[in-house]
From Swiss-Prot:
The record marks 8-9 as: Reactive bond (tryptase). One of its GO terms (molecular function) is serine-type endopeptidase inhibitor activity. Pfam families: Kazal_1. Disulfide bonds join 4-29, 6-25, 14-40. Acts as an inhibitor of human tryptase, trypsin and chymotrypsin. Probably acts to block host defense mechanisms. Coiled coil: none annotated. Residues 1-42 form the Kazal-like domain. The keyword Disulfide bond applies. The keyword ATP-binding does not apply. This is Leech-derived tryptase inhibitor C. Keywords: Disulfide bond, Protease inhibitor, Serine protease inhibitor.
């Protein structure tokens, strides 16, 4: 898992992989594009 210099703010986004990320920075750091704002139907990943 990569270490990302992301702010610790909770503004959930749903990634293209169907997972919820705490914020868009974390999603992008994991190589995932943002599908939509807000949570996906599944749990949050940090």
């Amino acid at each position: 898992k990569k270490v990302c210099a992301c702010p610790k703010i909770l503004k959930p986004v749903c990634g293209s992989d169907g997972r919820t990320y705490a914020n868009s920075c974390i999603a992008r750091c994991n190589g995932v594009s943002i599908k939509s704002e807000g949570s996906c139907p599944t749990g949050i990943l940090n």
